[in-house]
Structures are given as structure tokens and as C-alpha cells.
Design a protein with these regions (language model features):
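Bacterial N-terminal signal peptides
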Residues: 6-17
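Core of compact, soluble alpha-helical bundle domains
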Residues: 21-158
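Positively charged n-region of N-terminal signal peptides that target proteins for export
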Residues: 1-4
Length: 158
């Protein structure tokens, strides 16, 4: 249900265009969710949840989780207008050889919601953050279905 609502929020964000961005003097999403301390706590919980999630933890078996947690913080801080610069690789390059499925991407999304719940970020703010991340799915997921019917348009991918 949360995933559906997250997708619904994405549509609302895309339709609303720049309405998701803070105007002059308005607090940013970064500030609204609680700033650095809250976001760092959420990313720490997120990594802990991922580590214990048998649906996806194998993907991170050879990952430096401290560095990964920092990259997550930078990325989330950046997209929520916290003033951070993301120093990691782009999503397509970082995930190119991992063969991540839609099911694994959805599991990661569920884990993110759980992390946000654990640090008491309100659900409406969770949806705003997830909506900002949702466009990355195309660069991360590698099991896009391609129809065998030549009359059906096939995704071009990257």
C-alpha cells in the first residue's frame, strides 16, 4: 500500500512541477524532515534494515556500508535541497552489473519507508522524498520487460 501511495505521490509531484520545490523563505524538504541529524539517523536505520533484509542484502555483500551510508546521506540531502553535493557514481553506472529486479527495487523502497518510520518522519514527507527518488528506478532496474510482439513498442533502455 505504501508503495502504491509513493507512486501516486510521484504522479502528483510530476503534475505539480516545481510546486515540490521550496519557494524563497519557505523551509526546504531537508529542513522539514528534520535536517542533518534526522536524515543521518534515517540513513543509518536504512542501512541496518538493508543488511537484515534477505530479499536484497546479498546485493550489498561486498559493499563498504559506512561509505554507502554516507553516499545515501549525500544523495538524499541533495535531492531534498539540504545543500549537499552527491559524490557517488551516477545510478546507471553504480547498478549496471547488479541485475537488480523490480522486486528488489520495491523491497529497497519498503526498507526506506521502514527506516523513515523508525526515526518518526511523517508519512506525507516520506512520500515526497520517495517521489523524488522514483525516477531513478529506470537506471537501477535491469529486468525491464520487453514484449515479443513486434507491434508493441519496446523500451529503449540505456
Amino acid at each position: 500500500m505504501k508503495l502504491f501511495l509513493g507512486c501516486l505521490c510521484l504522479v502528483a509531484t510530476l503534475v505539480g512541477g516545481g510546486a515540490a520545490l521550496a519557494g524563497p523563505g519557505a523551509p526546504t524538504l531537508f529542513e522539514t524532515i528534520g535536517g542533518e541529524a534526522k536524515l543521518r539517523a534515517a540513513m543509518h536505520e536504512f542501512v541496518l534494515i538493508i543488511e537484515s533484509d534477505d530479499r536484497i542484502n546479498f546485493t550489498f555483500a561486498n559493499t563498504d556500508l559506512k561509505k554507502f551510508e554516507q553516499f545515501l546521506y549525500e544523495q538524499f540531502c541533495n535531492i531534498t535541497q539540504g545543500g549537499c553535493q552527491y559524490t557517488g557514481r551516477d545510478m546507471y553506472t553504480a547498478h549496471a552489473k547488479l541485475n537488480i529486479t523490480n522486486a528488489e527495487f520495491n523491497a529497497l523502497t519498503e526498507d526506506l519507508y521502514e527506516a523513515f518510520d523508525r526515526v518518526h518522519i511523517p508519512y506525507r514527507l516520506q512520500n515526497k522524498v520517495v517521489a523524488m527518488l522514483a525516477p531513478m528506478q529506470h537506471d537501477v532496474v535491469k529486468d525491464h520487460v520487453v514484449s515479443q510482439d513486434p507491434a508493441v513498442a519496446k523500451p529503449t533502455g540505456k
